[in-house]
Amino acid sequence: MSLTDTPNANRLHITLFGRRNSGKSSLINALTGQDIALVSNTPGTTTDLVSKAMEIQGIGPCLFIDTPGFDDEGELGELRISRTLKAIEKTDIALLLCEDTTFFHEKEILALLKEKNIPVIPVLNKIDIRENSDHLATYIEEQCKIHPLLISAKEKIGIELIRQAILEKLPSDFGQQNITGKLVTENDLVLLVMPQDIQAPKGRLILPQVQTIRELLDKKCLVMTCTTDKFSATLQALARPPKLIITDSQVFKAIYEQKPAESELTSFSVLFAGYKGDIHYYVESAAVIERLTESSRVLIAEACTHAPLSEDIGRVKLPRLLRKRIGENLQIDMVAGTDFPQDLTPYSLVIHCGACMFNRKYVLSRIERAREQHIPMTNYGVAIAFLNGNSG
């Protein structure tokens, strides 16, 4: 992703669901105007999730996701279906392609989507070659409680209807969240203290830093940045103390001890706890750390799938802090990317990263899973603040 692109995590996620060879790939190609998904008459051509970022007038940045057919068979088919089901967790709006009156698989997916309160747009494709489109549309309406859009992806018929339907189904709260909330307003001075360690390769800032700076500029704040070792010098160079200081969780304690009394302090990870997740549940769950014992089991979940670094926060620094507090025998498991367990009951606590690479819907679905299983879940920044004795 370039610095001028909207991160996929901030885009409206529109997922196409349907049977094999129902025309999902053709439709995503028609919607995006590009041949990004392989099209074939052979069922099961799409073997993994295929995504395409684009802009839709009136909506803004979107991410279309093409899924494998949910009627796939065999061992490989089961793997494809599991990936399709995982896609539901990150879906903001679903396009459900319907084929005929054998509606068994469609009903299953429809029930899952409704359970997650995901808006559904039923679509009847291939009207250019069907003879019973109206009859089938009536049947689909009875099943979905909404009239399907009649289209032909191949002939580009009805594509604009889908774009309009997406606009109408846009969740009312989509895009309303912002990183810094009500912490700052126009003309406030904000200082970002950003340690440039091995996790931030030379010539690059990490995504949370980039997104936060951009938002602060949009809010017309006065934005200053410095590295940890230049924090004191930067404060001395300023005419007034910053209204807000934002730093990395790993240096939170050091910055807290040096900051002006009138300056508020938070971390990128704490900000992203509210931006992507449920900050109240995270804070409530962090208190569980006090009750952990060496026989407890903790799950640390990382959104990224990068190769582990020598001082990685999730794999090294956070486990070190936990074992220092709880004991060396504390069992800690690590998962990355989409490998998040369905069953969380073996764990006393889940600690998630800031999830800058995930959309809000995906993070909230993980929180919902933890809540349903009565498992506390917090994130890196909140956990580190608790372990360091800082609740700010």
Regions found by a protein language model. Name each.
Residues 115-121, 126-182, 189-191, 220-229, ...:
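Canonical P-loop GTPase G-domain recognition
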Residues 14, 190, 296-298:
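Conserved hydrophobic helix-helix packing surfaces used for dimerization/oligomerization
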Residues 1-78, 82, 86-89:
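Conserved G1/Walker A P-loop phosphate-binding module
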Residues 52-60, 65, 75-148, 178-182, ...:
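Conserved C-terminal guanine-recognition region of P-loop GTPase G domains, centered on the G4
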Residues 41, 70-76, 98-101, 169-171, ...:
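Short, flexible loop segments at the rims of nucleotide/cofactor-binding pockets, characterized by
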Residues 1, 19-25, 203-392:
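C-terminal effector/interaction modules appended to NTPase cores
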Residues 183-209:
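Long, well-ordered amphipathic alpha-helical subdomains in the mid-to-C-terminal portions
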Residues 67, 97-101, 118-135, 149-158, ...:
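G-domain G4 guanine-recognition motif of GTPases
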